[in-house]
Amino acid sequence: MSRVKTSPMMLVAALAALVSNLPARAAQVTDVADAIDGDDPFDANLELRVEYTFHRALITRENLQPPAAGGAARTVHVREFEYMRHTARVRPRLEIGLFHDLAVFAEWPLPAWDQQNWSYASGTNAGNSTMARDMRNPPVVDNWTEPGTVYGSPGTERNQGHADWNFDAEQNGEFQKTRSGIDYPILGVRWSPVNNERDDTKPTITLQFDYKPAFLLPVMQHPEDVPGPLSTFAADGTHRLHFAVAFSKRFLILDPYFLADYTFPFASDAAVLGLEPRHDGGFRLGIEIIPYENPTLDQKFVVDLSLMTRYFSPGRDYSEVSDALNELTWTDEWIRAGAQGALVFRAWKFVSFDLTAGAYYDTPHYVTTEVIGCDGGCSSPGILARAVDAFNPNKRLDGNIQVRDRAERNPYYNPVIDTPGRRLRVDESFYFTVIAHAMVTF
């Protein structure tokens, strides 16, 4: 009996022939609702996404240690607090096709539960915590923390002591803050100028622009509320412009993709005074594996695996210590990296479900790093020195910062936690996320 010899190339060719007639629908990151396209006059996707995120981090603090025998004094990071945050959000979304691979969408994040918890880290107690020590007896730094002194917003001193914090310093360091309410809606447009489904020699390229307007909703704290603790509202008073581009190209049962995006934020008039939100941008590299696809029933099962990284710029924003300290803090830049996997099942042409799990890590970064001030006065964004004196153009800049001069000092600088050697830092910061998503197509 003769045998037919096969080769790897023949197997690939056979597999290609097997899947050549399957619908080459774009990867999820590049799929856009369609309209006025042949026998498909109109598409609309109605989606519901439920997200749960757990964030755990260790809050450490710089602390000057006594010199060892024959050595010099040194600064180390001592353990202060364990930080945990549980966040649950519901995100309804509607995407409506306008023309060939052109759609508009609206999404509204609804925070169902947002709870933060602080407590002393393992090995830390009321007797050895540097934060508890400073709450009892705030240190004197450049005469800024003498009894009766305060710090705060330009024009009006904030009626809050330098160490007027929310920690239960004499017990276990516990503090809990819960937020609720609704967040700002997201309005955007998506367009695929090139589509792999229309031309299988080309990738699908999808461009997206969306805007998150900060209006109408109560924010975490209004400027007129100073002094006082940050509120329990979920909105933060920040407008956000978001830009993204994604690429995908189907090959047999594989659909690799790449997504890059950037968010440009700016504070609204209703934001907490001094808010300078962080910019962020990143990319995601992944692949969809399609082990099962039935064109007759219009069904598909997908395994989606991806890696991501994201950069966060410095800024005066809400941080892991803001609610506990009753203030926004200036944070250093950091990078977030992680991986996620998803199972996607398209049960029918009009219905699909997916479940995603992810784990992410933030690089260590300081979260209290305000500068003491600027010669000649400070300006935004951030705390930037001016070329000439802001309040007296005839005054020569002498290179010195007069901390007693309101024109030159940084009003957001808190010497107890912003002075090098006393700053707070976020270490061992991990995120774990689970997302359930359902979509109905009309």
What spans do the regions from the language model cover?
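Outer-membrane beta-barrel biogenesis signature
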Residues: L22-R74, E197-K202, D298-V302
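Outer-membrane beta-barrel channels and translocator barrels
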Residues: P41, F99-D101, P111, V194-R198, ...
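Residue-level detector of the transmembrane beta-barrel scaffold of outer-membrane proteins
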Residues: D43-R49, A103-F105, T204-Q208, D255-L259, ...
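Residues on the lipid-exposed face of transmembrane beta-strands in outer-membrane beta-barrel proteins
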Residues: V50, V90-L98, A106, L187-W191, ...
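Transmembrane beta-strands of outer-membrane beta-barrel pores
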Residues: V50-L58, W108-D114, Y184, P193, ...
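Outer membrane beta-barrel transmembrane domains
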Residues: A68-G70, N128-W144, D164, D269-F442
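Residues that define the transmembrane beta-barrel architecture of outer-membrane proteins
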Residues: M84-V90, Q171, R179-P185, P203, ...
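Outer-membrane pore/translocation modules
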Residues: W113-L273, P393, P411-G421
